[in-house]
């Protein structure tokens, strides 16, 4: 890490999260923007990264060449798409640098590819990079463990903006995994994603998901534990994308001196022992 701070690459630089990352890196001591990458053919390629993020010129031109961007970098922050993130994971592994992945909608097969890349890269991957959500996941696991499945039903409700393309959200699935871990069950077997028509009575021990989409909602998540005559709700509301950008930058700096491996935000925040 140089005297000006950890050299970070932002991929997906033209998107909402990419622009938020550029702004926050510019404001955060201990890190610096090394390069910014947008997809080939993007109208933003060749433009100044600071200008598109509302900072004014900062002297870093957006490129569509990740190989060149990763050269001499120390970390990459990635909120793109599953296929694109897997490509970047391979490049990060070749470069032996940190790769922070906030991309959602990844399949189990995608996860295996990330883990393979982590043999050479320090990969931090999470469905949500915020401190609050990761604390919520720990509390969800503890509550699921304490409240027995026969008497307490778990439902996970999430809402996001109308442009989000995957459902349930990565955060909802993260919370579902936490609930399943507390109950010592497999989420794939226990989850109920769709209810329509005559569904019959709710099966004890299942973990339900409900998805809402609309407007400009950044992210709202609630885990509901419903018992006879009482209900416990654990909720998180995101008011600004900067919470995810801030968490991703924190993760990159944390991973700088770590061994190659596959890490989560619980590791970054020192909460993994609570799993």
Swiss-Prot record:
Q: Which Pfam families match?
A: DapB_C (PF05173), DapB_N (PF01113)
Identify which top EC class this enzyme belongs to: oxidoreductase
GO terms for MF: 4-hydroxy-tetrahydrodipicolinate reductase; NAD binding; NADP binding; oxidoreductase activity, acting on CH or CH2 groups, NAD or NADP as acceptor
> Where does this protein hold NAD(+)?
12-17, 102-104, 126-129
- Does the keyword Amino-acid biosynthesis feature in the UniProt annotation? yes
Keywords, comma-separated and alphabetical: Amino-acid biosynthesis, Cytoplasm, Diaminopimelate biosynthesis, Lysine biosynthesis, NAD, NADP, Oxidoreductase
Write the gene name: dapB
> Function, please?
Catalyzes the conversion of 4-hydroxy-tetrahydrodipicolinate (HTPA) to tetrahydrodipicolinate.
Identify the PANTHER family for this entry.
4-HYDROXY-TETRAHYDRODIPICOLINATE REDUCTASE 1, CHLOROPLASTIC-RELATED (PTHR20836:SF0), DIHYDRODIPICOLINATE REDUCTASE (PTHR20836)
Q: What is this protein called?
A: 4-hydroxy-tetrahydrodipicolinate reductase
Q: What organism, scientifically named, is this protein from?
A: Agrobacterium fabrum (strain C58 / ATCC 33970) (Agrobacterium tumefaciens (strain C58))
Concerning PROSITE patterns, the annotation shows: DAPB
Q: Where is the active site?
A: 160, 164
């Amino acid at each position: 890490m140089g005297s000006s701070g950890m050299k970070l690459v932002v991929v997906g630089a033209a998107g909402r999260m990419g622009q938020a990352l550029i702004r926050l890196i510019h404001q955060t001591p201990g890190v610096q923007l090394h390069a910014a990458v947008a997809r080939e053919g993007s109208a933003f390629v060749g433009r100044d990264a600071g200008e598109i993020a509302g900072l004014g010129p900062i002297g870093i031109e957006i490129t569509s060449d990740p190989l060149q961007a990763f050269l001499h970098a120390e970390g990459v922050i990635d909120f793109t798409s599953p296929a694109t993130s897997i490509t970047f994971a391979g490049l990060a592994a070749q470069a032996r640098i940190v790769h922070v992945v906030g991309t959602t909608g990844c399949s189990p097969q995608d996860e295996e590819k990330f883990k393979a890349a982590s043999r050479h890269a320090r990969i931090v991957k999470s469905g949500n990079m915020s401190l609050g959500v990761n604390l919520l996941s720990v509390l969800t696991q503890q509550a699921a463990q304490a409240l027995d499945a026969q008497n307490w039903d778990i439902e996970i409700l999430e809402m996001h903006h109308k442009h989000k393309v995957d459902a349930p959200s990565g955060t909802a699935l993260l919370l579902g995994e936490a609930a399943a871990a507390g109950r010592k069950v497999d989420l794939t077997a226990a989850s109920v994603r769709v209810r329509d028509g005559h569904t019959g009575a709710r099966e004890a021990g299942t973990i339900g998901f409900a998805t809402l989409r609309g407007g400009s909602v950044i992210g709202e998540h609630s885990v509901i534990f419903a018992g006879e005559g009482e209900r416990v709700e654990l909720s998180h509301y995101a008011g600004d994308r900067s919470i995810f950008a801030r968490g991703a930058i924190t993760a990159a700096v944390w991973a700088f001196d770590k061994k190659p491996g596959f890490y989560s935000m619980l590791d970054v925040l020192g909460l993994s022992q609570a799993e």
